[in-house]
Design a protein with these regions (language model features):
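Asp-based, Mg2+/Mn2+-dependent phosphohydrolase catalytic module
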Residues: 2-10, 15-19, 26-36, 45-69, ...
């Protein structure tokens, strides 16, 4: 197939704790030399597009903010469309306000230690961190049980650091959905909107793109659902046991390609 562009997950594919994975910079240079468009789709909510691009560039990968699509950007688009002028309570680890222009954040976890805030119109859940404490999550659960819409920037249950795996928003969200009997809306991966938005930004059709990720479900298979060609890398959160269990199911969708790391991508693409 013609290569219209390549969509990369970031954490665990290009970097781990913002330290470059061996061969990542060389792969991006090869794609640039071959004039193959690139986009970067991440559920990272601790940093803005500008900060992410700066960190990748400092790690030897020339990336511009316009090439980065974050879960916060997608969430802001969703809220503006679905809940215009909503008063939003935000729980997130990191300041991402620059990626959410026009969103009315009436309260956030800066209110910890004070009384319970007024009931918001919408609750926004970003990435997990110290802000996900007992009191704050109790507020969110109370509002969720009352029927206040909860919009999660993603459903990721973990991410990879140089010190090992860390739990993420999805761990908490699953529990609150179970006990409240209500479902949150998740906007980031594996929802299709981010994959489609990334293709649209490059001006190509999804079936002309490759998606490269370390998460079998949230990255690779989710991209394949919208027509992209999936490439699973054996770095980051990849676990061989997970792939083996998946491969044993004859009815399950399988990744189109599996490679050791992003360093092997040029060879796979015939570059």
């Amino acid at each position: 197939m013609a290569i219209g562009g390549v969509l990369f997950d970031i954490d665990g594919v290009l970097v781990t704790s913002w330290k470059p994975i061996e061969g990542a910079a060389a792969t991006l240079r090869t794609l640039s030399e071959q004039q193959i468009a690139r986009s970067y789709l991440t559920n990272t909510t601790t940093r803005t597009r500008v900060q992410i691009a700066d960190l990748l560039t400092a790690a030897g990968m020339a990336v511009s903010p316009d090439e980065v699509v974050t879960a916060a950007v997608l969430t802001a688009d969703f809220v503006r469309d679905r809940y215009p002028d909503a008063r939003c309570f935000l729980v997130n680890s990191g300041d991402i306000s620059d990626d959410m222009p026009g969103i009315d954040i009436v309260a956030s976890v800066d209110t910890r230690g004070g009384p319970m805030p007024d009931t918001p119109d919408v609750v926004l859940l970003g990435g997990a961190g110290p802000e996900y404490d007992h009191v704050t999550l109790s507020w969110v659960y109370d509002w969720m049980a009352q029927g206040v819409p909860v919009v999660a920037m993603h459903r990721s249950t973990s991410w990879t650091t140089t010190e090992g795996l860390r739990i993420d928003t999805g761990m908490y969200l699953l529990g609150m959905e179970e006990v409240s009997g209500r479902k949150a809306t998740a906007v980031g991966k594996p929802a299709p909107e981010g994959f489609l938005a990334s293709a649209a930004r490059l001006g190509v059709e999804p079936d002309e793109m490759y998606i490269v990720g370390d998460d079998l479900n949230n990255d690779v298979l989710a991209g394949q659902v919208v027509g992209m060609t999936g490439v699973l890398v054996r770095t980051g959160k990849f676990r061989q046991a997970t792939l083996d269990r998946w491969a044993a199911d004859e009815f399950a969708m399988q990744p189109n390609h599996v490679i050791d790391s992003v360093a092997d991508l040029p060879e796979l693409l015939g570059l």
